[in-house]
Amino acid sequence: YYLNYPILFDYLSQAEKPVVWTLHDCWAFTGHCSHFATANCYRWKSGCFTCPLKGIYPRSIGLDRSRENYADKRYYFNKVKNLTIVTVSQWLNQLVQQSMLRYDNLICIPNGIDLNCFRPIDHIDPKYDFAGKKVLLGVGTKWTREKGYDDFVELAKHIDDDYRIVLLGLNVNRVNRLPDKIIAVHRTENMDVLVQLYNRALVLLTLSHNDTYPTTNLESLACGTPVITYPTGGSPEAIDETTGCVVEAGNFNALIEAIRTIDRNGKAHYSAHCRARAEKLFDKDLQFAKYGELYKQITDPAHNAAVKITD
């Protein structure tokens, strides 16, 4: 967001080298925002102005330059002749096709994860027993309303006492104001802790209102834990009917019923399907190989004629 892109794209257009640009959000084709869903704003399709999200990250203080930013991006980002755009979800891929980015070379390569790290385990540390309650897990790095914090607080008012919401990544201010049925686990860089929590959970809840393709969904599935998600961005692409479900954003009756359905069926009903889906679709080595094939295509004309990348 803070790159001097006019200088960069001037250079790339003059260098005449193959370029691969991986998009993780919508910033490249809007006049300001990285996600537009919460504002229900589609001005990016024709030209941004009077941005309703200029106070949201990446925050703009003072003047609204969304009109100028949009024009600048349209000019500079379309200058590179030999550019391939990669999106991490089909949802984002479809948005790019509707945007001012005019490139035919557009493919989807999803995020990948380390399946040796994120895996089912037999032993859970007793400190994550949580008094034997059934764990509804939420994982985040910066908990905001857009990332679903308010939804978890509201959900806590409606769940039965045999459930507990466990939120990973809360800051101190949030921790001090939590309802009784929410347990905080401080942010950690220790992957073992994350794997323990995924395995301990009955289900991962992805209640974000803005997202592109949450890696947490993939990590949870790899650990054998099903996912319930809102229909946000590309989040539903990670699951199918054997590994979780999609519920309407903010519909807590539907969310609670989905939780109860998974609970009635039992986590074991889903675990093997979750792991199998992760092994088939989300192995990081699989995604690395797709990038490798892409690089061969754009640098080797003979290889380009013989091999085609598939999404």
Please name every model-derived segment.
Residues W91, G112:
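Carbohydrate-associated surface elements
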Residues H209:
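Aromatic "clamp/platform" in nucleotide-sugar-dependent glycosyltransferases that forms part
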Residues Q97, I113-K127, N176-R177:
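Acidic anion/phosphate-binding donor-loop and adjacent secondary structure
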Residues P226-T229:
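Short hydrophobic beta-strand element within catalytic cores of glycosyltransferases
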Residues Q196-A201:
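Short alpha-helical donor nucleotide-sugar binding micro-motif in glycosyltransferases
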Residues G169-V195:
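Nucleotide-activated donor-binding/catalytic signature segment of Leloir-type glycosyltransferases, i.e.
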Residues E241, C245-F252, T261-K267:
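Conserved acidic donor-binding segment of nucleotide-sugar-dependent glycosyltransferases
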Residues Y128-K147, V153-K157:
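Conserved donor-binding/catalytic core segment of Leloir-type glycosyltransferases
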